[in-house]
Amino acid sequence: SFESIIPFIVTAPLGRLTFYVEHYPWIDFKSHMKEILDFLEGSLVSDVHSHKLETSVLDNSTSSSYNPVSGMLFVNDLLTMTVVNFFGCNSRLNSYHRFDMTKLDINTFLKALADAFKKIANYLEV
């Protein structure tokens, strides 16, 4: 008997997207899932728009940063890792990578994100 105060949990272990959703007979499950997907997409888009990558050289940085002179990227958060990996970086958390940040096109990333959510909604038939 799973009990929680969180109405849903979304995980993606090893890239396998999994939804844990509490279901009640008085709630329309399809519209509920549509609201969850809309919320998740809105949150991700907002996070992408508000994300800032440090470009000054800092010793012992705890946040992701990029040195435009050397082309070295320090990846220390999931959002940076996801975006640069989308553009071919193959980065890992808490590591340095040589990467050309001019390859990034956030509009292309956001379009792919929107397309992914449409595919998920179609798959779930919501």
Swiss-Prot record:
Subunit structure, interactors included: The DNA-dependent RNA polymerase used for intermediate and late genes expression consists of eight subunits 147 kDa, 133 kDa, 35 kDa, 30 kDa, 22 kDa, 19 kDa, 18 kDa and 7 kDa totalling more than 500 kDa in mass. The same holoenzyme, with the addition of the transcription-specificity factor RAP94, is used for early gene expression.
InterPro entries linked to this entry: DNA-dir_RNA_pol_35kDa_poxviral
Any one GO biological process: viral transcription
Primary gene name: RPO35
Organism: Sheeppox virus (strain KS-1)
Official protein name in the record: DNA-directed RNA polymerase 35 kDa subunit
Function, in words: Part of the DNA-dependent RNA polymerase which catalyzes the transcription of viral DNA into RNA using the four ribonucleoside triphosphates as substrates. Responsible for the transcription of early, intermediate and late genes. DNA-dependent RNA polymerase associates with the early transcription factor (ETF) thereby allowing the early genes transcription. Late transcription, and probably also intermediate transcription, require newly synthesized RNA polymerase.
Family affiliation: Belongs to the poxviridae DNA-directed RNA polymerase 35 kDa subunit family.
Cellular component aspect of the GO annotation: DNA-directed RNA polymerase complex; virion component
